[in-house]
Curated annotation (Swiss-Prot):
UniProt keyword Cell membrane present: no
PTM sites of type Phosphoserine: S186, S282, S292
Bias-annotated ranges (Basic and acidic residues): 189-200, 269-279
Record key words, sorted: ATP-binding, Cell cycle, Cell division, Cytoplasm, DNA replication, Nucleotide-binding, Nucleus, Phosphoprotein, Transferase, Ubl conjugation pathway
Region (Disordered): 185-295
Domain notes: The acidic C-terminal extension is essential for the cell cycle function.
Organism: Saccharomyces cerevisiae (strain ATCC 204508 / S288c)
A biological process from GO: silent mating-type cassette heterochromatin formation
Biological role: Catalyzes the covalent attachment of ubiquitin to other proteins. Capable, in vitro, to ubiquitinate histone H2A.
One GO cellular component term noted in the UniProt record for this chain: nucleus
Name assigned to this protein: Ubiquitin-conjugating enzyme E2-34 kDa
UBC core domain span: 7-169
Amino acid sequence: MSSRKSTASSLLLRQYRELTDPKKAIPSFHIELEDDSNIFTWNIGVMVLNEDSIYHGGFFKAQMRFPEDFPFSPPQFRFTPAIYHPNVYRDGRLCISILHQSGDPMTDEPDAETWSPVQTVESVLISIVSLLEDPNINSPANVDAAVDYRKNPEQYKQRVKMEVERSKQDIPKGFIMPTSESAYISQSKLDEPESNKDMADNFWYDSDLDDDENGSVILQDDDYDDGNNHIPFEDDDVYNYNDNDDDDERIEFEDDDDDDDDSIDNDSVMDRKQPHKAEDESEDVEDVERVSKKI
């Protein structure tokens, strides 16, 4: 295997895994390999999930073939069987600028709209779904379909509805057609920043404790109690601040349910008071003796 083919194979394998990963896959496409030993030929089911589209509900089979120098050359895309669409040839080949090689003298398409190595399989498939819903009638591949689309829209819609119903027989056994709601949820998960997911699980995110730029804990003004720098806690929690020598400073909360640990030992208090009581009694005796002598 040549180095270029090996590069293409590795790239396609990675993109195939991403597009078939349940967590990352786009609901509009069902993708399988024609042969498990050949990464260069993909069988694809194209679905339009927009409920307002006349193509909604269809499962349009297609095949994608990749050249050995991919991504430097574009893949080929063909609907199998062909569908009635202004930009689909009667043999099923798709006429779309993103799959045309740049610099082709047979077309007048600007290079910005043609194939480039930065394109991916995903970007191509998304462009195809967009073209299904919004045909380019200025460059038709099927003239009859283009005329119907422009001059006989109702006739065109009826023809497409027939295509949609016919395509349903190609839905793989056991495959559940996605809905527009599932597509929205899937896209929302992809768009959700990882920081937001982590933030939802972060205890301190909704706390009154903030971090400064150095990661140290800062106490807000309303955290202090009458100027004593004491943070009140409920349920007699004990607030300990450990000023360790290392860079990690921790705040520890200890729930002490044993009253003996938090309460004052009455016996020890009485013991501390006993000397004062003895001194008071001694002074009283001396006063009595002095009075007796005077009498």
